[in-house]
Amino acid sequence: MPNISLSSRCNLHCPYCFAHETMGAGSGDITLENFDAALEFLTRTGPVNIGLIGGEPTLHPHFDEIVRRAVACENVAMLTVYTNGLLIEKHADVLSLPKVTLLVNWNAPNELRGGAFEQIKRGVDELVFNRDMGRRINLGLNLHGESMEYGYMLDLLKRYGFDKVRISLTVPEFPEGCGQNAIERFRACKPFLLKMFADMDAIGVLPYYDCNRPPWCIWSDEEKQWLRDLAARHGADECTLVDTESFCRPVIDVLPDLRAVRCFGMSAFEKVDIRDYANVNELVAHFMRRIDRPAYRIKAMPECENCHLRRTWLCCQGCMGYKMVEIEKMNAERGE
């Protein structure tokens, strides 16, 4: 799903954020003219789901107008607002419009200050209990180490009666984090993930992965069967927890100045002007050639050498940002 970044500003400083490269830089807030141009570009080939991101998108001074414009666009099938939740009560009227869904990345109480946790709760309460938006809100949990406190999230999921939660295994800022090995990190997180999944299953919640999904090969046969059984209990035999394929394709994030990146994880690699491309498909093809093609040729571990999934672009072995330096070298060798 392509995204439009409304602002490079944010009212939090999350330890796991990989968007610092664009935060507080560039042109700040997107102009309404540029928003209209970005929306037209992304929907030029037909109906599509669009995300509003940041920074924190709700900080934009014309956020309500932007949401209304996007909802009114007949080629916007669904509009997802990615938010930390601090200002959703203020914008409840537009956030409850048709087509709008929310992904609330809700940090732990010890990571929030000055009543921020309760402020987020008031906003979600308003949308769920007074605006009947329970089926249009997802909560997000961001794992930025090998473990974390997640009891608060279990309480929130029970409070709102939610039956799913997004799990994001965050990545370091690139290119500084390129020396790390994604597979080793996934393996280190396994005990924690299995315990957390079991605790979520116990309250009727099915977790699902964001990008940077662990490859299926990190699990033992016993663990694979346990995950299959968990998914089956929720009637979700094809959910991300048991998907044998672990890959991503260019997302396309349009920045306030109308430059685009493949995704925030690769934002330091290359930014291109959307006005130089006929449509979003042409832009995707550009990033596939410049980033994805070399990325799938790079082996994260020796055992990846003969992996059929890697060879057929169905396992990217974690976020491509880990391979950024190697991708640049391969492109240079090809004269790009």
Which residue ranges define each predicted feature?
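Canonical Radical SAM [4Fe-4S] cluster-binding loop centered on the CxxxCxxC motif
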Residues: 1-33
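N-terminal [4Fe-4S]-dependent radical SAM core
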Residues: 1-3, 44, 285, 289-290
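Short acidic donor-binding/metal-coordinating loop in glycosyltransferase active sites
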Residues: 6, 54-55
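Disulfide-bonded cysteines in secreted/extracellular proteins and peptides
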Residues: 10, 14-17, 217, 239, ...
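Short, solvent-exposed loop/turn segments at secondary-structure junctions
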Residues: 11, 57, 87, 109, ...
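Radical SAM/AdoMet-radical enzyme domain recognition
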Residues: 32-53, 60-186
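A C-terminal junction/extension of Radical SAM enzymes
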Residues: 174-268
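Flexible mid-to-C-terminal extensions adjoining Fe-S/redox cofactors in radical SAM and related proteins
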Residues: 259-336
